[in-house]
């Protein structure tokens, strides 16, 4: 199965759907779904996902290179792994999504969207994770969902962590720092993301990794993510990474800007970078007679997007943690 990406993009079913790699067994579970199981017993399970948005291709290329290293035997596998290419149709078309944003649909929220390929795929991925986690006895469960951002950022690589009732494990946060993430953003409320679903339903330590800017296949400079690729290789092979000398900055979400109607105006232009700072009292958005302003001394914007569909998030506002 050294042509997983090509098969996924073409929508082709392989003639052989299971086999042996170098020290592991593989099973093709469907388009964009590949299970890898080491020959030796392990108690660690990992979801490695990318391509939830079809125009975010750099992480897909990174996973393709990792799979090539595993199949060639140059990389040893020490986790049960489910590789997920989230939205094959959008990936093949080179667009963010075909109908609706899948990363708002998980945890059953797909039921509130008009039926589409994305709603069906979100349901399929939920079932795939349920099957994967229930079929093993993993003591450790991780989910790394790899993305790229629509716009530039003051932090080239950063992580977004779902709301979680229990404290985050230090080795997980340390690995994120070793993977080159410059900042970590902690959600304070549930959401429809893939990582919130895996964390809430299966107790996984989950993080959305944002790696640079969205570009078409073949136009990505993967060298700027070499530290993340090296960390993923070390993780898969069970090699401990040295901790970062400068730990990631930490932020928490303090509010969400939501577009409710066509009267919505976001006062940020296309050049506004993720993590741009705004002073207390700054007008961020208006919608009819409702005004959204900065309420803390300093807040930082994340994922500003004035053109989202009505009812969806047009941005997050953050505060720095000590």
UniProtKB/Swiss-Prot annotation:
Cofactor note text: Binds 1 zinc ion per subunit.
Disulphide connectivity of cysteines: none
Domain of life: Bacteria
Catalytic activity, as annotated: N-succinyl-L-glutamate + H2O = L-glutamate + succinate
SUPFAM superfamilies assigned to the protein according to its UniProt record, in alphabetical order: Zn-dependent exopeptidases
EC number(s) given by UniProt: 3.5.1.96
Record Pfam families: AstE_AspA_cat, AstE_AspA_hybrid
Residues bound to Zn(2+): 53, 56, 147
Function: Transforms N(2)-succinylglutamate into succinate and glutamate.
PANTHER family, sorted: ASPARTOACYLASE, SUCCINYLGLUTAMATE DESUCCINYLASE
The protein's name in its UniProt record: Succinylglutamate desuccinylase
Organism (species): Salmonella schwarzengrund (strain CVM19633)
């Amino acid at each position: 199965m050294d042509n997983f990406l090509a098969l996924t993009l073409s929508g082709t079913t392989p003639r052989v759907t299971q086999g042996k790699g170098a020290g592991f067994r593989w099973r093709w579970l469907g388009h964009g779904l590949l299970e890898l199981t080491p020959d030796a017993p392990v108690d660690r399970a990992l979801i490695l996902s990318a391509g939830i948005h079809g125009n975010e291709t750099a992480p897909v290329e990174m996973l393709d290179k990792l799979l090539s290293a595993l199949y060639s035997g140059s990389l040893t596998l020490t986790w049960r792994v489910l590789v997920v290419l989230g939205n094959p149709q959008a990936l093949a078309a080179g667009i963010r999504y075909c109908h609706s944003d899948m990363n708002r649909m998980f945890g059953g929220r797909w039921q509130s969207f008009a039926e589409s390929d994305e709603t069906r795929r979100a349901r399929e991925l939920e079932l795939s994770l349920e099957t994967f986690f229930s079929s093993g006895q993993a003591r450790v469960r991780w989910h790394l969902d790899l993305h790229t951002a629509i716009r530039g950022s003051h932090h080239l690589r950063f992580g977004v962590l779902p709301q979680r009732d229990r404290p985050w494990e230090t080795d997980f946060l340390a690995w994120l720092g070793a993977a080159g993430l410059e900042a970590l953003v902690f959600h304070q409320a549930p959401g429809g993301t893939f990582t919130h679903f895996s964390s809430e339903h299966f107790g996984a330590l989950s993080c959305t990794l944002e790696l640079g800017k969205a570009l078409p296949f073949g136009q990505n400079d993967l060298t700027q993510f070499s530290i993340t690729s090296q960390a993923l290789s070390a993780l898969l092979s069970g090699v401990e990474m040295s901790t970062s000398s400068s730990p990631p900055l930490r932020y928490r979400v303090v509010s969400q800007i939501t577009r409710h109607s066509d009267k919505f105006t976001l006062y940020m232009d296309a050049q506004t970078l993720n993590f741009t700072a705004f002073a207390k009292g700054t007008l961020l958005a208006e919608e009819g007679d409702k005004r959204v302003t900065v309420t803390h001394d300093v807040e930082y914007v994340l994922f500003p997007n004035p053109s989202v569909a009505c009812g969806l998030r047009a941005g997050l506002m953050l505060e720095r943690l000590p």
